[in-house]
């Protein structure tokens, strides 16, 4: 009898454990934030149409609501969805780098139809981190609405290290002293890239 009672208690404990594990899995799969983070991919092929501006407004609002040091909001954001202006930028970047493959330079936007240019205030030490947090909020909110994105560093260099592109940087109209820090392309995906492995070994608990 005692043996049967023990088995019964073990069965109840096991069932309870399995129920909790199942609930945990279900909670994770039903959590939109976690699902968005885990399914987001960098998109390098886009459909030609620009992201609707009302959708971009939501993405931008999510961006500027990112955490930032001392609430300095040490960023400025410019959005370009005019294909002619994006073409002007591509041409200027290629002309400004005559020793580089022009197709490679012109392709640095990855043909994203909507480009966001983020500048930082270098007078604040942590402004670069703030811009990164802003961009992360944007790409996650975009993905949750079916909009792909890609964070880009090469256009920053191509646009800022030569005189050919200066008129276009001036056209973006950043405040005096602000420096272009990051570019993010947005658009509707024309590919479904697989997830790339992440190295969990780089994460450790320290007791």
Predicted regions mapped to residue ranges:
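Sec-dependent signal peptide recognition
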Residues: 1-7
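Acidic, surface-exposed loops and disordered segments
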Residues: 14-207
């Amino acid at each position: 009898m005692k043996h049967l009672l023990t088995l019964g208690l073990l069965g109840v404990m096991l069932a309870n454990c399995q129920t909790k594990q199942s609930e945990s899995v279900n909670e994770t799969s039903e959590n939109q934030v976690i699902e968005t983070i885990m399914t987001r991919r960098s998109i390098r092929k886009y459909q030609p149409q620009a992201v609707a501006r009302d959708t971009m407004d939501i993405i931008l609002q999510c961006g500027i609501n990112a955490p930032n040091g001392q609430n300095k909001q040490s960023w400025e954001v410019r959005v370009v969805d005019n294909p002619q202006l994006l073409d002007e930028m591509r041409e200027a970047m290629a002309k400004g780098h005559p020793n580089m493959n022009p197709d490679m330079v012109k392709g640095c936007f990855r043909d994203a139809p909507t480009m966001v240019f983020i500048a930082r205030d270098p007078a604040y030490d942590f402004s670069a981190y703030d811009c990164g947090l802003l961009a992360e909020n944007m790409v996650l909110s975009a993905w949750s609405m079916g909009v792909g994105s890609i964070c880009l560093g090469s256009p920053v260099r191509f646009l800022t290290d030569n005189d050919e592109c200066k008129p276009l940087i001036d056209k973006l109209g950043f405040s005096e002293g602000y420096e272009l820090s990051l570019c993010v392309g947005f658009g509707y995906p024309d590919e479904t890239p697989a997830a790339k492995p992440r190295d969990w070994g780089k994460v450790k608990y320290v007791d």
